[in-house]
Amino acid sequence: MAQQLDKSSDATALIGAMVTRSRAAQSVLGKSDFASRCAALQAAADEIRTQSAAILEVNAKDVAAAKASGISGAFIDRLTLNDERVEAMATGLEAMIRLTDPIGHELARWQQPNGLDIARVSTPLGVIGIIYESRPNVTIDAAGLCI
């Protein structure tokens, strides 16, 4: 039980540190221009390709551990990366580059009876947390959409 509490407090500390770093990054990213965000997405896609062998090696260890613990075949299929899935992660980021900039668009405008003008403008999300179970490619999709 004590070991379980240690793991829990370690996880809590790790998540707290990640949130702190994420908030600091958000304050910079939230002010970045579209070209900079596109460059970051391209750099991430390039790094995925550069590191694909290492990504597949670590994923193979995750898959082996999942199989050893008796996880279902469907779960293991979702967990498993191969060359095609890793390339799809990179091309997915590149597809996001071709989208229009979602930030700064006026979504609605109206005037209150007292004459106050109100505009709804798209803004960066800020820091988000994602909990998922078995699809490592979701990490890249979610991160790309957040950039």
PLM regions and their residue ranges:
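Substrate-binding/gating loop at the entrance of the active-site cleft, primarily
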Residues: R109-I147
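N-terminal Rossmann-like NAD(P)+-binding subdomain of aldehyde/semialdehyde dehydrogenases
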Residues: M1-D117, L145
